[in-house]
Amino acid sequence: MEALHKKIREEGIVLSDQVLKVDAFLNHQIDPALMKEIGDEFARLFADAGVTKIVTIEASGIAPAVMAGLNMGVPVIFARKHQSLTLTENLLSATVYSFTKQVESTVAISPRHLSSDDHVLIIDDFLANGKASQALISIIKQAGATVAGLGIVIEKSFQGGRAELDAQGYRVESLARVESLAGGVVTFK
């Protein structure tokens, strides 16, 4: 997606050969026009997938997920990282390790929002080692639902997440595939 590539080139900051900072438009400050384009593109890519719900993890996946949900006409559910007083039932949950935050947390979704009839699209801001995606897949399976595919805004192809998801037979559509961050330069695949 050229608009996303341009934004990454112009406003992304390479912090190391493993970390790309995109807080100017995706995961701190949000560019609504770009999010609309991202949502439109995910809706186009998964138009034939029979999606009934979209699932993401709070917080950075919410904006692209909502835009895709708006375009596709389906609800968006975000897995919570922190339990709320309003979440009192037995939750669907999984443990996830965050590469950038270097912390493990439990993410959860109320079972009232997913059923075995659902065909779920996972949307997330980044795909690195695939741990967040695997946690969401686990939650979806706990509900008896099926995974329609994964929509990733930025994939760090040099980390192993994509290969693992491909090996498991999941459809993965990434809008920007970063091949390398070596030398402080973003190289797209």
UniProtKB/Swiss-Prot annotation:
Catalytic activity entry: XMP + diphosphate = xanthine + 5-phospho-alpha-D-ribose 1-diphosphate
Keyword Lipoprotein annotated: no
Top-level lineage group: Bacteria
GO biological process: purine ribonucleoside salvage; xanthine metabolic process; XMP salvage
E.C. number: 2.4.2.22
Residues noted as binding xanthine in the record, renumbered to the chain: 20, 27, 156
Primary site of residence: cytoplasm
Gene Ontology MF terms: xanthine phosphoribosyltransferase activity
Binding locations of 5-phospho-alpha-D-ribose 1-diphosphate: 128-132
Keyword annotations: Cytoplasm, Glycosyltransferase, Purine salvage, Transferase
Cellular component GO terms held in the UniProt record: cytoplasm
Record keyword Endoplasmic reticulum present: no
Family listed: Belongs to the purine/pyrimidine phosphoribosyltransferase family. Xpt subfamily.
Its job: Converts the preformed base xanthine, a product of nucleic acid breakdown, to xanthosine 5'-monophosphate (XMP), so it can be reused for RNA or DNA synthesis.
Name listed for the protein in its UniProt record: Xanthine phosphoribosyltransferase
Organism per entry: Pseudomonas savastanoi pv. phaseolicola (strain 1448A / Race 6) (Pseudomonas syringae pv. phaseolicola (strain 1448A / Race 6))
Organism lineage: Bacteria, Pseudomonadati, Pseudomonadota, Gammaproteobacteria, Pseudomonadales
Gene from which this protein is expressed: xpt
